[in-house]
């Protein structure tokens, strides 16, 4: 779907022609969340008017909706967007930079932030330079400005720059790998990893539900993912009102699947090892 809806044409290093897929299943997640919004809207309509709704939603719809500034800009000016790597198409500087030792991201969104960046880095080089005086000019002269900044940033370590950015109130972040993220204090403070006991695997770490901090919370951090067919029998009995013999018949002939104690869950490995 990322290929069909143009996402892969704008993702990846700008100097390469190879299409790149976004590394997580974001479209599946967004479609689910959009579906929930549709359901909630339908429930509100039902409560107000007594009328139900048929919700028609597709991955394609959500992919186009999610193209936001890229898609809308094309609709306005008709120009096919190109790959920009980590760069932002309408804001400069807004991208990844390589420090002396490792990478960081810089997001200079406002003119005030750019003024602070100039004062931090090199007023003699950047100040009073009409090519960079406004964001529009910086977008036009992107390559020149990025070249100057990249040269400056390469002379000191990432921690040096991040500390200075913080002092000058300039948005920035280290570019972490997944291990770095799970080692961060905020990950632990926000309880972003749950530990549950799975009936066939044993102790199992899970990504937490982001709604866990809603008060009072309706999400649980103690229930493991269900086994294949774990609730089939319960649903057929309580919601479809099927008798036990019919459920057993459907299970035995393969029409449905009811989980058994010996069900095994395969664990994948997406590491580089």
What label would you give each PLM region?
Residues 167-220, 273:
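A glycine-rich dinucleotide-binding beta-alpha-beta segment and adjacent secondary-structure elements
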Residues 200-249, 269:
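Flexible, small-/acidic-enriched active-site or ligand-binding loops
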Residues 92-168, 172, 253:
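Aromatic-enriched alpha-helical interface/lid elements that frame and gate functional surfaces
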Residues 1-109, 116:
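Active-site-adjacent "lid/gating" segments in soluble enzymes
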Residues 63, 141, 180-184:
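Beta-rich nucleic-acid/ligand-interaction surfaces
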Residues 245-273:
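Amphipathic terminal alpha-helices
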Residues 52-60, 164, 247-251:
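Beta-strand segments within the central parallel beta-sheet cores of soluble alpha/beta enzyme folds
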């Amino acid at each position: 779907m990322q290929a069909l809806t143009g996402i892969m044409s704008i993702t990846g290093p700008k100097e390469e022609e190879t299409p790149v897929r976004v590394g997580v299943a974001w479209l599946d997640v967004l479609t689910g969340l959009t579906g929930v919004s549709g359901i909630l809207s339908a429930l509100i309509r039902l409560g107000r008017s007594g009328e139900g709704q048929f919700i028609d939603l597709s991955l394609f719809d959500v992919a186009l909706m999610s193209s936001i500034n890229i898609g809308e800009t094309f609709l306005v000016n008709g120009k096919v967007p190109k790959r920009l790597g980590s760069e932002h198409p309408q804001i400069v500087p807004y991208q990844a930079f390589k420090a002396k030792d490792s990478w960081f991201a810089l997001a200079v969104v406002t003119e005030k932030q750019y003024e602070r960046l100039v004062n931090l880095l090199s007023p003699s080089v950047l100040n009073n330079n009409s090519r960079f005086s406004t964001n529009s000019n910086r977008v036009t002269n992107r390559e020149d400005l990025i070249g100057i900044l990249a040269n400056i940033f390469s002379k000191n370590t990432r921690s040096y720059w991040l500390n200075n950015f913080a002092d000058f109130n300039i948005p920035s972040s280290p570019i972490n790998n997944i291990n770095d993220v799970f080692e961060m204090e905020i990950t632990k403070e926000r309880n972003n990893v749950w530990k549950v006991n799975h009936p066939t695997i044993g102790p199992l770490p899970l990504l937490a539900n982001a709604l866990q901090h809603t008060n009072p919370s309706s999400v649980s951090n103690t229930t493991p993912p269900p086994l294949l067919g774990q609730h089939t029998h319960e649903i057929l009995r309580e919601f479809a009102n099927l008798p036990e013999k019919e459920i057993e018949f459907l299970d035995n002939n393969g029409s449905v699947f009811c989980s058994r104690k010996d069900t095994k869950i395969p664990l994948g490995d997406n590491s580089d090892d």
